[in-house]
């Protein structure tokens, strides 16, 4: 088993340096796999947010100062330097992420690879942005010439979740900096360690002071002041739908743009024409048990054609029994702990309610017997689920899947869309025409065909309905942080001629 890393004690990263929180408060860091306190993080408050926003403002000075005016190529050099540093620290950062969040070490390593790749991707887009400025617009008249400028929005507030701490932060930080914005990042208080290490990396590579500021703390104390701050020009948030509504309300008071990536209750529709059941079974496993099911896009509603339901569930249970559940630092661990005691108790309550409402727990539902401490939950499979049950309608955010059987394609589509959410969905079928039909009628921002959960930095990510709006990743992620300006000039030597010219005296 890998040795736990030393936990650095960091302050708030503001204006290119470290400072203690104004009120001197700290929040303990709990390793969810052992329940041990392993360190602490600063507890920022509104006073610290004020300092962080002020640090970002002068650097940007409302789009006139060096970071915003720097070429995309210049900003790309910094982003590539961050990527290189992350690549050199992958093993350490992965261990830090593991003890902070409870996710298996192998998953954390993959996350860090993706973090570096994301910075590299947006470095390339930053460089390409130079060539897209002054793009002419074809007009039907000759007397005007028009082009478009893409400018940084300004100071952006980035509020990120605990399930992929550094990766979800990078999805926002990398495009924001590529666009020329300055940023105040507020990661979840449940998993902030790697985000603070990002501050140390920015210091190492000489990122101009104030371009990225990182504050840690509780949502009401540190997140809310960012959302309501008059000098924060945009908010990008990933987290719960309830908090998303609060952020929208705060931003609306200043007509401030927001982008929201919120909850989900995604369906995975599986038809009876699959020739290889094990190949099909692997996708709901990845779709709901990877990262402990703590994934906003988790395909936690499994819809099975009645002809395949029994053999499919038999194999799903066998696969679930075969998952290695252990301390996430152990080699080969495939299911670690959930993030916290509160999350553990909430998931257990979901399972208990499902049982009391009439669902059958086909497998799991409890703490693994061989683990006496830590916030571990077995992969849990619920059958006999009705559409009125809480387990069908609400996001669990844990390794809990609910199963419903269908007879026809139209019934499957109706069940798939029976949700307030619209982040993702999937279809498993050997009939590719059927897959295409289903992809077109599932009401979500992402649809997977014969897979679940591939997340590609080049492709848009985001949802519909109560899963939020706006898109991250790909070129769409960069556009999130750019303001479009039309510039038009009159080209003729003569008067435009709308008004009658007065006679000369």
Curated annotation (Swiss-Prot):
Catalytic activity: betaine aldehyde + NAD(+) + H2O = glycine betaine + NADH + 2 H(+)
Entry EC no(s): 1.2.1.8
Positions that bind NAD(+): 239-244
Any one cellular-component term (Gene Ontology): peroxisome
Active-site residues, record numbering mapped to chain: 261, 296
Localization per Swiss-Prot or TrEMBL: Peroxisome
Alphabetical list of Gene3D superfamilies matching this protein: Aldehyde Dehydrogenase, Chain A, domain 1 (3.40.605.10), Aldehyde Dehydrogenase, Chain A, domain 2 (3.40.309.10)
Keywords associated with the record: NAD, Oxidoreductase, Peroxisome
Main location: other
Pathway terms, separated by semicolons: Amine and polyamine biosynthesis; betaine biosynthesis via choline pathway; betaine from betaine aldehyde: step 1/1
Site feature location: Transition state stabilizer: 163
Motif range (Microbody targeting signal): 503-505
Enzymatic class: oxidoreductase
Statement: the UniProt record of this protein carries the keyword Chloroplast: no
Gene Ontology biological process terms, A to Z: glycine betaine biosynthetic process from choline
GO MF: betaine-aldehyde dehydrogenase (NAD+) activity
PANTHER family hit by this protein: BETAINE ALDEHYDE DEHYDROGENASE, BETAINE ALDEHYDE DEHYDROGENASE 1
Family membership noted in the UniProt record: Belongs to the aldehyde dehydrogenase family.
Assembly and oligomerization: Homodimer.
Protein name in the entry: Betaine aldehyde dehydrogenase
UniProt organism field: Hordeum vulgare (Barley)
């Amino acid at each position: 088993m890998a040795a736990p890393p030393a936990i650095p004690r960091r302050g708030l990263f503001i204006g290119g340096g470290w400072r203690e929180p104004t009120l001197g408060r700290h929040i303990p860091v709990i390793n969810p796999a052992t329940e041990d306190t392993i360190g602490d993080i600063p507890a920022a408050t509104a006073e610290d947010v004020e300092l962080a926003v002020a640090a970002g403002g002068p650097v940007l000075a409302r789009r006139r100062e060096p970071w915003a005016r720097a070429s995309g190529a210049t900003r790309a050099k910094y982003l590539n330097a961050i990527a290189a540093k992350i690549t050199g620290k992958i093993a350490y950062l992965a261990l830090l992420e593991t003890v902070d969040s409870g996710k298996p070490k192998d998953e954390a390593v993959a996350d860090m690879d993706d973090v570096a790749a994301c910075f590299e991707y947006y470095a390339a887009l930053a460089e390409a942005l130079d060539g897209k400025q002054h793009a002419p617009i074809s007009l039907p008249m000759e007397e005007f010439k028009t082009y478009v400028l893409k400018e940084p929005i300004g100071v952006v507030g980035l509020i990120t979740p605990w399930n992929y701490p550094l990766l979800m932060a990078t999805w926002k930080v990398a495009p924001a900096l590529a666009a020329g914005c300055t940023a105040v990042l507020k990661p979840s208080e449940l998993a902030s360690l790697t985000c603070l290490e990002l501050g140390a990396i920015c210091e190492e590579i000489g990122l101009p002071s104030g371009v990225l500021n990182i504050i840690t703390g509780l949502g009401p104390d540190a997140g809310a002041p960012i959302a309501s701050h008059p000098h924060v020009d945009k908010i990008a948030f990933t987290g719960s739908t309830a908090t998303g509504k609060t952020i929208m309300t705060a931003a609306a008071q200043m007509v401030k743009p927001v982008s929201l990536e919120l909850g989900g209750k995604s369906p995975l529709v599986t038809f009876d024409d699959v020739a290889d059941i094990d190949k099909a079974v692997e996708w709901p496993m990845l779709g709901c048990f990877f990262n402990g099911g703590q994934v906003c896009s988790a395909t936690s509603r499994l819809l099975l054609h009645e002809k395949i339901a029994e053999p499919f569930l038999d194999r799903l249970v066998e696969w679930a029994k075969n998952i290695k559940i252990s301390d996430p630092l152990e080699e080969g661990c495939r299911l670690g702990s959930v993030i916290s005691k509160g999350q553990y108790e909430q998931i257990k309550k979901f399972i208990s309610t499902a049982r009391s409402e009439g669902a059958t727990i086909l497998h799991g539902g409890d703490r693994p017997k061989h683990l006496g401490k830590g916030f571990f939950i077995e992969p849990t499979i619920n059958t006999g689920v009705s559409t009125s049950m809480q387990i069908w309608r609400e996001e669990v955010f844990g390794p809990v899947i609910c199963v419903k059987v269908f007879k026809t394609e139209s019934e499957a589509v109706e069940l798939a869309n029976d949700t307030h959410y619209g982040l993702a969905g999937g279809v498993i079928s050997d009939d590719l025409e059927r897959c295409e039909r289903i992809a077109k009628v599932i009401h979500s921002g992402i649809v997977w065909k014969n897979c679940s959960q591939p997340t590609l930095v080049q492709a848009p990510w985001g949802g519909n309905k109560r899963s939020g709006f706006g898109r991250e990743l790909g070129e769409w992620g960069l556009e999130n942080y750019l303001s479009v300006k039309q510039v038009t000039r009159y080209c003729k030597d003569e008067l435009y001629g709308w008004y009658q010219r007065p006679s000369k005296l």
